[in-house]
């Protein structure tokens, strides 16, 4: 087992979010702002423009149009009668498909949900499709003071020139980090009398006696381990690793970059999942079923545990998704840690082709700073799609015709209503979570520009990497790689000179550390 060794630090994200809320709230309804760029509010009051968001799947909500109309009516009430939004994804139906990255480089959208997690996506968008961060700040000068603390959280890939770098708008999230968790079925734990034992587990191996207990009681009718999330067990060995899928990844234990497929923690993960399949903890039929198909079959005691990343208050959201079939408990397997992918995985891109980027930037800021707008887009219309109970908790109507599932990626989570089961002191829990988060030594290091890669055939490497992901990604996710599969992966990566990729990253990272020592 590889354990985390990085020091603890405080993060700035929580305070940036609070600052954004306070400052924007102070100017709500006023013509002015708070500084040299205050005239932007007057311009927006006299601007007519529809800001078009591309958000995957929202148009499938039956009351989508009703909520958007209510949102635009609210903008008029706030003094911006010419501003409106449109959220759809008519040409981005398969948004998780890698080929959909090509859509991001064109189209007439002003703002696009842009979970660009790998250089593959960056290559598809290179060429100036997105406005640089500084340009976004310049569009609405008031944002400079508000959003400056977010600069260190920008994950940037791209070419050498500033114009081709991919900068994105960071979302105002409720946390700047996450931790690796085991989530377990409270119904089962209580029946087996193991609730406290599960809460006190320190690593994945300590689950085995309870997995064996579950299998002995439920046999083939249950799932001791839910396999479709088991690939996230890798994060219990090497934090952040599962996002890389065979590419180079930062190893906090050696403070260096190495390839995913050649790392000792990957071997450990493969050995563990093979063992769990052999012992019957993960039923073989899970290898052929998708999570959505399996979840439709879940009953109150269908499984014992699965693994994921999490945050404070996460149990409430999980229980809501379970729709009363079971309740979840959580065991924390790692400290909270700041991770670029987690921070920027919900970012939005501002299209350089926007006909009015100032209006788009302004409206995004408005959405992220106004409580009514944030809750409208996330919950729908109060009294229609949800009601607030006596404690101010949002209880969705049944059945609700609007369930956006945007809480984690659009709006300001600090301004959102609480969900059933979330504690009243949730903001304080977030603050504690962030204050105790680990910040890796490589935080802020960006992939080197083209000059650093001279003499390295990255196109060939990326081609091999893409082919391997297509062939083996699902096997990696569910932990079913054979010896022959693993040998094939390593042989092809070696032929593609993965060592050169690691060498360049480590050379440039060493230079980065040297330049930042003072």
Can you say where each PLM-predicted feature lies in the sequence?
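Extracytoplasmic/secretory soluble proteins
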Residues: 2-4, 11, 15-518
């Amino acid at each position: 087992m590889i354990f985390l060794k990085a020091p603890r630090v405080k993060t700035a994200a929580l305070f940036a979010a609070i600052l954004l809320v306070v400052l924007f709230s102070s100017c709500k309804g006023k013509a002015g702002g708070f500084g040299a760029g205050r005239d932007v509010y007057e311009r927006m009051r006299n601007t007519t423009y529809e800001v078009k968001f591309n958000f995957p799947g929202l148009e499938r909500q039956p009351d989508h149009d009703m909520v958007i109309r209510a949102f635009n009516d609210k903008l008029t009430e706030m003094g911006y009668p010419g501003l409106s939004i449109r959220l759809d994804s008519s040409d981005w139906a398969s948004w998780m498909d890698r080929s959909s990255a090509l859509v991001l480089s064109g189209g007439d959208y002003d703002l696009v949900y842009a979970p660009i997690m790998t250089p593959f996506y960056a290559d598809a968008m290179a060429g100036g499709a997105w406005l640089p961060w500084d340009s976004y700040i310049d569009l609405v000068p008031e944002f400079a003071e508000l959003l400056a603390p977010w600069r260190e959280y920008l994950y940037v890939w791209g070419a050498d020139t500033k114009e081709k770098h991919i900068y994105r708008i960071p979302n105002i999230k409720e946390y700047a980090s996450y931790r690796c968790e085991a989530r377990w079925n409270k119904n089962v734990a209580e029946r087996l009398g193991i609730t406290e034992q599960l809460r006190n587990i320190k690593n994945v191996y300590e689950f085995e006696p309870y997995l064996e207990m579950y299998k002995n009681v439920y046999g083939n009718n249950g799932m001791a381990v839910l396999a479709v999330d088991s690939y996230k067990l890798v994060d219990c060995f090497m934090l952040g690793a599962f996002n890389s899928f065979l590419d180079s990844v930062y190893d906090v234990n050696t403070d260096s970059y190495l390839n995913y497929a050649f790392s000792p923690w990957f071997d450990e993960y493969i050995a563990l999942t093979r063992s769990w399949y052999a012992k019957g903890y993960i039923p073989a039929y899970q290898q052929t079923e998708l999570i959505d198909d399996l979840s439709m079959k879940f009953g109150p005691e269908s499984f014992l545990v699965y693994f994921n990343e999490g945050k404070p208050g996460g149990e409430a959201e999980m229980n809501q998704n379970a729709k009363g079939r079971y309740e979840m408990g959580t065991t924390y397997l790692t400290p909270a840690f700041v991770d670029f992918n987690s921070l920027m995985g919900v970012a939005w891109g501002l299209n350089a082709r926007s006909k009015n980027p100032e209006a788009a930037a302004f409206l995004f800021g408005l959405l992220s700073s106004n409580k009514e707008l944030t809750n409208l887009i996330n919950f729908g219309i109060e009294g229609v799609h949800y009601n607030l109970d006596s404690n101010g908790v949002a209880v969705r109507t049944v059945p609700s015709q609007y369930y956006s599932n945007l809480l984690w990626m659009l709006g300001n989570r600090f301004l959102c209503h609480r969900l059933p089961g979330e504690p009243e002191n949730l903001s304080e829990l977030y603050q504690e979570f962030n204050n105790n988060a680990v910040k890796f030594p490589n935080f802020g290091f960006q992939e080197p520009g083209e000059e650093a890669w001279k003499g390295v055939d990255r196109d060939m490497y990326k081609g091999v990497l893409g082919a391997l992901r297509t062939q083996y990604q699902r096997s990696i996710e569910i932990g079913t790689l054979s010896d022959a599969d693993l040998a094939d992966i390593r042989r092809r990566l070696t032929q593609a000179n993965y060592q050169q990729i690691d060498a360049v990253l480590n050379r440039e990272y060493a230079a980065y550390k040297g330049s930042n020592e003072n």
